[in-house]
């Protein structure tokens, strides 16, 4: 009987030896650094008011180790979240928000970037939800099967875990416009439980701004009367990356535009950019963005969007040169039409291996409309006037694009 109780204890309580321990927590003027004795797979940060605090939940970890304060942080407290992991609470001496973060050292180090703000901005940011960080590596044995914690499994591990069933075929959205016109599908990035990037200035969420921008683009295009338009989502819902371009292909779209807001640790980073597909990133920032956006599906608790290297190669092989050239041509048109209307980065046309652009026969771009982490860009993205300028730029570019294609036939 004793051995059965021991086995039940391990099964329902998790194996203590598999948990990662928090070794050290250090705070400086503009960042928090948390170190672990073994790799950690995921964490999430969020803000709490009355009193002002930053909370960080770490999946599969146990509290412990050294801690120090500094900068805006007056105190550090660690505790357990049952079988789900550890929580670190940072008591603030002055308001500060989380502007970004990342894992390094193979999951053994988490760096969270901080920025001081005024009390009103902190209060607004408390409504923004969680900012999530992931390494893509976690030992499955560290989290009990019954746990509600999201699990991201190392692809090299030889373990079996239960995953949510795939959703059935998603309903196709409404198409608006005259039936004889070419179809443009506009994809508002993120949505549902995935907020995307969050403004440290206003607490605005990327998922809300992209939906407003997509609706403005739709309305501008319909007013022009030259194309039909459909939105992949017209409400706050989550779509996996393949569903987004699959909707466009099933509808027979002639052009796909995915709308996003960029974010960077540097608060001075500013300007819109336009991405087209390439397996080789055009620069380091393009590679960073691809890594961030391609992980969007992981937020559902399992990486439904992950493809093997072989499948990824097949997709690229299938992508016709004509399609990639058409995408690049539209990107240049959009940049031209946005000049003087929407602030652009000097090298606004970039290339990256973005999953949402991998439809093999559909010209596609990802439009980063500005930096939500930059105060001026965020104000523009949140304003009706700013969205109108973006939408009119898209309308002009779309109309020229299809006029040229008609003339070339």
How would you name each of these model-derived features?
Residues 15-183:
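Signal-peptide-cleaved, periplasmic/extracellular N-terminal interaction regions immediately downstream
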Residues 43-45, 65, 193-197, 375:
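Short, solvent-exposed loop/turn elements at domain surfaces
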Residues 265, 315-409:
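Active-site-adjacent mobile loop/cap segments within catalytic or ligand-binding domains
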Residues 2-13:
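Bacterial N-terminal signal peptides
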Residues 151-311, 320-332, 388, 392:
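Catalytic-core regions of hydrolytic enzymes
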